[in-house]
Amino acid sequence: MRYDFSKTEKKWQARWKQQETFKTGEAPEKPKYYVLDMFPYPSGSGLHVGHLEGYTASDISARYRRSRGYNVLHPMGWDAFGLPAEQFAIKTGTHPSDTTQKNIANFKETLQAMGFSYDWSREINTTDPGYFQWTQWIFLKLHEMGLAYMSEVDVNWCVELRAVLANEEVEEKLADGLTVVRRPLRQWVLKITAYADRLLEDLDGLDWPENVKQMQRNWIGRSEGVEVDFELRCHRTMLRVYTTRPDTLFGATYLVISPEHAMAEKLATAQQLVAVKEYIAKAKLKTELERTGLQKDKTGVFTGSYAINPATGEPLPVWISDFVLTSYGTGAIMSVPAHDSRDWEFAKQYGLPIIEVVKSPHDVQQEVFEGKDSTVVNSSNNDISLNGLAFPEAFELMASWLEKKKAGKRKVNYRLRDWIFSRQRYWGEPIPIKHYPDGTLKPETSLPLMLPEVEAYQPTETGESPLANIPEWLNGTDENGPFRRETNTMPQWAGSCWYYLRFIDPHNSKLPVDPAKEAYWMNVDLYIGGAEHAVLHLLYARFWHKVLFDLKVVSTKEPFQRLFNQGMILGEDNEKMSKSRGNVIPADHVLQTYGADAVRLYEMFLGPLEQVKPWNTNGIEGISRFLSRVWRLVWPEPEGTRADLSTLAPSPDLLRRMHKTIKKVAADTENLKFNTAIAEMMVFTNELHRTGEGSRIAVETLLLLLAPYAPHLSEELWEALGHQESISLAPFPEFDPELAQDKEVTIAVQVNGKLRGSFTAAPGSPKEQLLNEAKALEGVKKFLEGVTIMKEIVVPDKLINFAVK
């Protein structure tokens, strides 16, 4: 009988669905394992083979953990609100709700065709009123706690999309060729900065890729420094700057303030006022990214005013430059051009003084020196001398001196800004707030607050949401009088901030999640998704989770204990898949051609899960041949005669090979090293064909190992061997440690690091026995004659090295 993957896969997918094989409930007597994918937004273009990689990895982990006796929660849902869904709807001329439902059906069909073991009874959709009523409820809790507030702020406005972008989104949109400008708008803002320290500190306990943790640390940007007051000549006030290098105060030769600084125009003298106003106007047209890029040309304008350096008493010119941001520190900096590259370039551009205050190995007039390892020079007055001190001591001494003189104070600052949360779009969760004529705000008392049914949902050019043009929804009256509903909607990130909790209890109409169920399932044991979400979704979700922890809605401080970022699968041309390049490989196409099991195995066999790798159609054909070889272990003849497998114990060599395979596949699957686990199963399959023993025990063991990876084929062969219960519910095989150990190991022998011979020995042989055998080797003896052995290094079961003199 030949393997018909299409017939087999449809058969088992239907049976899993009918028997609810993967439906999950709480089982306190079992250890739990919550494995989660970053759920997709259902775009109109459908899934390509790159999307399947992470989902396949999580499914293998889920199936493996079930076979190990865990109660596994492995759900799937749809992040369907927000800009991507709305853009697609506008492009196609259909309503977002219609396109979203159609796209979800398309995505779901593909995922089910892959045989993923999701518990579909827990499926969620962020646009479902039963879901977003709790998103709105969480927002109201944030508002109640003072963590959601309104503010007139300069925002990143995307001209083409007619939408506000979060700071974290700007770079991606600029890369797409879109225009982003700054403009003031009334916004809802979430006070994520109130949780900055906790977001930073709790990273240490997470099993996440270090690069992702570092990206979050950098984004939060905690720094310890000093706020220094510079007296402004002729203005009878102070200009406060923030610096992390108070030890370099003697080297400050000018000050720079941001174009948005409250004193920017006030500091302009009559002669400089026109130039200052022109510069400020130009700066407003630039994005933050354009202003702060390290490669950009440094621009600025002199205000005409001076401030007194508290350490030297010298007047310092006050400049305005767009590389300084009001949102960080005080919006004003002291510039020490000898020891900061940006300040050095600015000083060179405008002919400003450069004074060395940290001992440099070269001339600071010609090249900046930014090292902290040197000592302070040229830094003393009648009250204080920093000369000869290293950075930590100089920092402390200057900070204390400034505090004593009441000219400064220690300060902790963050790069992290509060999260601009509202969007001027239709397709998002309505913000459940009512505005009254006297300026008071009150929450909607009945949730969910639904979006109105409308025909025209395109964004406006004015910056107002389309909801502002629907008076019957916008205006109302209650016991407090007439009110106007909030017209901004939530961003696409809102629903994904807490979806992992709703999977635990998706049908609860009384609470976002039942406390007992949350306590059982949380936190997520394995979360798989792209690293591109490091400072967006992953940071936002951690923030909301901490708020919910404070509200006692959740019992854990963090949502995701282990994070794994899969590497990207490139097109066959080694480029990122995109429609513009024409190199997208649709998932449906390869599924129809090769089948789900082949796609699953191939994507995992391409290379380490975390690495970027190109798709190669020849490779998947090789995987198909491997599956056929497994099939022929049970159905060797095309005519349909099943193999007559022996119930006798395998031969000693095959038995040892089998236990080594179990050990290797188990360890690799546990550690997400799927490519090497598959390679090991290929070796074992070849061994089964080579020996021709026809051992039932060995073949069944192979199927149990293969089941998490190629579940359809494994189910079909398992049933063919007479098993009634699904292999998806069968326990993973155990290995015998003694049988899984090599009978002999090869010991390499080196003299001063150079290989001089080798020999075989039993694993775990005593050190003295190994040394004696090594010294007896002909190729080693001659290098030990007439020399003194200084050290004997023995690496058990691997290596001996003699250090001689």
Swiss-Prot record:
UniProt keyword annotations, A-Z: Aminoacyl-tRNA synthetase, ATP-binding, Cytoplasm, Ligase, Nucleotide-binding, Protein biosynthesis
InterPro entries reported for this sequence: aa-tRNA-synth_Ia, Leu-tRNA-ligase, Leu_tRNA-synth_edit, M/V/L/I-tRNA-synth_anticd-bd, Methionyl/Leucyl_tRNA_Synth, Rossmann-like_a/b/a_fold, tRNAsynth_Ia_anticodon-bd, Val/Leu/Ile-tRNA-synth_edit
**Gene Ontology MF, one:** aminoacyl-tRNA deacylase activity
User: What's a GO cellular component annotated to this UniProt protein?
Assistant: cytosol
Task: Indicate what this protein is called per its UniProt record.
Answer: Leucine--tRNA ligase
Family per record: Belongs to the class-I aminoacyl-tRNA synthetase family.
- The short sequence motif called 'KMSKS' region sits at 576-580
The organism is Chlorobium phaeovibrioides (strain DSM 265 / 1930)
Motif 'HIGH' region at which residues? Answer: 40-51
Which residues are listed as membrane-spanning?
A: none
Catalysis performed (reactions): tRNA(Leu) + L-leucine + ATP = L-leucyl-tRNA(Leu) + AMP + diphosphate
GO BP: any one term:
leucyl-tRNA aminoacylation
Binding positions for ATP? K579
The EC number on file is: 6.1.1.4
Q: Where in the cell is it found?
A: Cytoplasm
Q: For this UniProt entry, what is the primary localization, expressed as one broad class?
A: cytoplasm
